[in-house]
From Swiss-Prot:
It comes from the Eukaryota. This is SelT-like protein. PANTHER family: SELENOPROTEIN T, SELT-LIKE PROTEIN. The keyword DNA repair does not apply. The keyword Transferase does not apply. Disulfide bonds join C64-C67. InterPro entries: Selenoprotein_Rdx-typ, Selenoprotein_T, Thioredoxin-like_sf.
Length: 209
């Protein structure tokens, strides 16, 4: 086995092991920083925040992070905060359904199984009672480097698909005002502004900002 073949073999295995490590490793505990003691004093101007037309209202934008919707969510957040001063806009991930998330965790295991079968099938098949490996195994074995690379790429694509929810859900004060899952599209800025205005506890008046 020459140097090029070793690289082609090692790269997919390294990336696959990296995916498995990131998937099953729990996130590190958040370090608790000691905040310096705050000096409590009364200021003359904090009441300005309460004069904003959006003060006291909360908008939640739950979107699919793995679908690259973050840019759209941030743009909508900035627009709403500029139109409704004082409005609290919260961005959060909208996860895929539980069955899809479970299948997404199975994919890396299947990738390891397929790659292991390609590399050591001649020993694995007799262990499970199959004396002669099937014809499809010989086809994969004949081009084992391409087969392993394809297994890794297709597995990553499938895992990304299973982790995607395709959601862009907007709620105002706990009430759903727009759902991409139902509408099949993103909301327009003017449309979203009007939806939020009709749901706020302090109605938005044109020209009041």
């Amino acid at each position: 086995m020459d140097k090029t073949q070793l690289i082609l073999l090692g790269l997919p295995i390294f990336l696959l092991c990296s995916d498995l490590f990131n998937l099953f490793t729990p996130p590190p505990p958040k370090s608790q920083h000691q905040s310096p003691p705050s000096i409590s004093e009364t200021l003359d101007f904090p009441a300005q925040k309460s004069t904003g037309v959006g003060y006291g209202n909360t908008v939640e934008i739950n979107f699919c992070i793995s679908c690259s919707y973050k840019g759209t969510a941030v743009s909508m957040k900035k627009m709403l905060e500029s139109v409704f001063p004082g409005l609290d806009v919260v961005l959060a991930n909208y996860p895929a359904p539980a069955p899809k998330r479970i299948l997404a965790k199975v994919v890396p295991v299947a990738q390891v199984g397929v790659i292991g079968l390609i590399m050591g099938g001649e020993q694995i098949f007799p262990m499970i009672g199959i004396a002669q490996p099937p014809a499809w195994y010989h086809s994969l074995r004949a081009n084992r480097f391409g087969s392993m690379a394809s297994t890794w790429l297709l597995g990553n694509f499938l895992q990304s698909f299973l982790q995607s929810s395709g959601a862009f859900e907007v709620s105002c004060n706990g009430e759903l005002v727009f759902s991409k899952l139902k509408e099949g599209r993103f909301p327009g800025e003017i449309e979203l502004r009007d939806l939020i205005s009709g749901t706020m506890t302090k109605p938005f008046v044109t020209g009041s900002y």
